[in-house]
């Protein structure tokens, strides 16, 4: 579901809006990435089945 949410956000919101994806915060694969939605649209990522928090900045 996480990957589908990112894909949906990139098609519905302005490309200049920032999206922060914080995943597996208490695990060994901890990751916090912030980039414009226009970059998320072309990025390679896989956050499925990983506890993830999404933050949007306008």
Across the structure, where does each feature detected by a protein language model lie?
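A contiguous loop/helix-start segment that scaffolds small-molecule binding in enzyme catalytic cores
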Residues: 1-58
């Amino acid at each position: 579901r996480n990957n589908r949410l990112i894909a949906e956000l990139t098609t519905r919101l302005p490309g200049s809006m920032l999206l922060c994806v914080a995943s597996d915060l208490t695990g060994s694969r901890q990751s916090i990435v912030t980039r414009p939605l226009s970059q998320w649209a072309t990025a390679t990522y896989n956050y499925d089945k990983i506890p993830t928090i999404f933050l949007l900045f306008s």
